[in-house]
C-alpha cells in the first residue's frame, strides 16, 4: 500500500509554488523558513524564522492567509449578538462557536458548539460535525482578557483553521482578536484578512496594535532600522536550528 507523505520539506524556488502536502509543509525560502498548508476553504503561510542573510537562489516567502471566499462580517456580528444574549455581565460564562462553509452552497453559517461553560473556560462538543469542519473557531473571553491564553494554545493545537476570541462583549467597546493556526504554529491577523468588511461594533485588536507599532516606528525615525536589525540578529541565532531539524 502506498502511504502518502503527510508532511513535506522543500525549498521555495518560485513565489507561486503550489502547496502539495496533505497535512502541511516546511519551506526554506530566500528570507526565512515557513510553514504552509491548504484545505478546501483556504490556504495559509506562517513564518517560522526570518533570515538575516538572504539566499538569492531561492524565492522570497511571505506570511499570508487566503480564503476561497471571505467570511461575511455579519457572521461575526450575529455571533456577538448571540453571545451577549446567552450570558449577562454579572454572571458571565464563556461560549464557543464554529463558523463553517456549506459544501454545496458555499455559504457560511455558524453554530454554538459548547458542551460546558464556566467563567473562564468552555469545552467543545468535539463530536459535532460543525466543530470538526470549522473554518473559524471563536469563543468569548472574560472582561479584560484580550490575549489568547495558554489554555487556548493547548486546545488549539493539532488543527489547521482560524481562531478567534471575543472580549468585553457587554461593554460599549467589544473587541475581537484573530489568528491562523497551522498545526501548533500561530500567527495573529487583522480581521480584514478573512472578512468581506470590517465587523461593526467590534474593535480589531490586531489591527489596532499594528497601527500603533507603525506609529512608534515612525516616531523613531532613523533609529527604527537599528531596532529592526537587532531583532533580525536575535532571530538569526535560531535559523540554523530550524534548518538542522528539517
Residue positions per predicted region:
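Conserved beta-strand-loop surface patch within small alpha/beta domains used
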Residues: 1-136, 143-246
Amino acid at each position: 500500500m502506498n502511504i502518502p507523505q503527510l508532511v513535506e520539506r522543500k525549498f521555495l524556488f518560485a513565489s507561486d509554488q503550489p502547496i502539495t502536502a496533505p497535512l502541511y509543509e516546511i519551506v526554506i525560502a530566500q528570507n526565512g523558513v515557513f510553514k504552509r498548508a491548504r484545505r478546501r476553504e483556504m490556504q495559509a503561510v506562517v513564518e517560522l524564522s526570518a533570515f538575516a542573510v538572504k539566499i538569492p537562489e531561492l524565492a522570497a516567502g511571505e506570511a499570508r492567509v487566503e480564503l476561497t471566499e471571505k467570511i461575511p462580517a455579519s457572521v461575526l456580528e450575529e455571533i456577538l449578538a448571540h453571545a451577549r444574549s446567552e450570558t449577562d455581565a454579572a454572571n458571565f460564562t464563556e461560549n464557543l462557536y464554529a463558523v463553517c462553509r456549506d459544501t454545496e452552497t458555499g455559504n457560511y453559517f455558524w453554530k454554538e458548539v459548547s458542551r460546558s461553560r464556566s467563567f473562564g473556560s468552555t469545552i467543545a462538543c468535539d463530536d459535532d460535525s460543525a466543530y470538526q469542519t470549522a473554518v473559524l473557531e471563536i469563543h468569548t473571553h472574560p472582561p479584560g482578557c484580550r490575549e489568547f491564553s495558554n489554555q487556548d494554545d493547548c486546545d488549539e493545537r493539532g488543527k489547521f483553521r482560524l481562531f478567534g476570541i471575543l472580549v468585553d462583549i457587554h461593554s460599549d467597546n467589544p473587541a475581537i482578536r484573530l489568528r491562523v493556526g497551522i498545526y501548533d504554529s500561530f500567527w495573529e491577523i487583522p480581521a480584514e484578512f478573512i472578512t468581506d468588511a470590517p465587523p461593526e461594533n467590534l474593535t480589531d485588536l490586531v489591527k489596532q496594535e499594528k497601527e500603533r507599532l507603525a506609529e512608534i516606528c515612525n516616531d523613531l525615525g532613523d533609529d527604527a532600522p537599528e531596532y529592526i536589525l537587532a531583532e533580525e540578529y536575535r532571530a538569526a541565532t535560531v535559523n540554523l536550528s530550524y534548518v538542522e531539524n528539517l
